[in-house]
Amino acid sequence: MTALILLLAYLLGSIPFGLLVGKIGYGIDIREHGSGNLGGTNTFRVLGAKAGTIVIVGDMLKGTLAASLPMLFSVPVHPLLAGAIAVVGHMYPVFAKFRGGKAVATSGGVMLFYSPLFFLSLIAVFLVVLAVSRYVSLSSMAAALYAVVYTVFFTDDIPLTVAVLLLASFIFYRHRANIQRILNKTEPKVKWPGKRS
């Protein structure tokens, strides 16, 4: 049963909401537009706020639902393990030729299930950095770095610390190209309403 739960978590994570929303709602393959990424940020840029929001919420719910599977089926699997497996599915989805997202929203969904207050603090860090920098990628990495610092130095929850270290490493690894573009000052910025650049 443990293996079945982990397989189900991976399959949940593999649901490519960006691909589904693009093809069903707009008749396009989101992987062929913008950055080519299946995540919510690229969907926002290519298809707009409505589609982007749907994808982000869907990607988050994958993590939340996957983390809840052990409880729902009364299986002795740690929710953070099931959630981490879903994040792997999100990054390397079997339903989308293993070309997936950058682990941010699904990781957030895992944290939402495990510790809602911690999740809210992550959102706060993300929004503050986004307001200052206008870089979604930098804001995501800043939230991941905050999560690492907080769990390593300010909590005794070992499973959470291990999970955060793993998920943060996923996030930084998947943002390698973004880091280079930030350094080169070619990374796209969020355009606030009323702002020209």
UniProtKB/Swiss-Prot annotation:
It is a multi-pass membrane protein. It catalyses: an acyl phosphate + sn-glycerol 3-phosphate = a 1-acyl-sn-glycero-3-phosphate + phosphate. It is an enzyme of class 2 (transferase). One of its GO terms (biological process) is phospholipid biosynthetic process. GO terms for cellular component: plasma membrane. One of its GO terms (molecular function) is acyl-phosphate glycerol-3-phosphate acyltransferase activity. It is found in: Cell membrane. Catalyzes the transfer of an acyl group from acyl-phosphate (acyl-PO(4)) to glycerol-3-phosphate (G3P) to form lysophosphatidic acid (LPA). This enzyme utilizes acyl-phosphate as fatty acyl donor, but not acyl-CoA or acyl-ACP. HAMAP family: PlsY. Probably interacts with PlsX. Belongs to the PlsY family. This is Glycerol-3-phosphate acyltransferase. The gene is plsY.
